[in-house]
Regions:
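Amphipathic alpha-helical interaction surfaces in cytosolic regulatory modules
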Residues: 20-99
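Generic beta-structure capping elements
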Residues: 8, 17-19, 82, 104
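Short acidic-hydrophobic, aromatic-tinged amphipathic segments that line or gate anion-handling sites
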Residues: 100-108
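Short beta-strand/loop segment at the start of cytosolic alpha/beta domains
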Residues: 1-15
């Protein structure tokens, strides 16, 4: 799992690449926590670009839960561009009820 973070206008975009599984969830969690800290410090929303994420286990979902708690309502975390597999995971786990999920990172669609 690789991670990229960039500022795009008035938001931060974090992009996990590959799979978040038993071997990589700790790295994902560390990158995500750092991105939330950066978003809090800059007072910017955080968009997770899931378009390059193939799969996520329950440990990755737990990392999302912890990031939401860390954000404490001060930062909005949006999940963008999930593939069909990730959409199913988010739906089955009901994470699509916890986080805004949008089709594309580009706010204009």
């Amino acid at each position: 799992m690789d991670w990229r973070l960039r500022k795009d206008g008035e938001r931060l975009i974090g992009t996990p690449v590959g799979r978040v599984d038993e071997d990589s969830w700790r790295d994902f969690s560390a990158h995500l926590n750092a991105a939330v800290r950066d978003a809090l410090a800059a007072q910017l929303p955080l968009v997770l670009d899931l378009s390059e994420l193939e799969f996520m286990t329950s440990k990755g979902l737990r990392a999302l839960t912890m990031a939401k708690k860390q954000a404490a309502g001060a930062v909005t975390i949006t999940l963008a561009g999930p593939n069909l597999t990730m959409r199913r995971i988010l739906s089955i786990s009901r994470y699509d009820m916890l986080f805004p999920v949008v089709d594309d990172v580009d706010p204009t669609g």
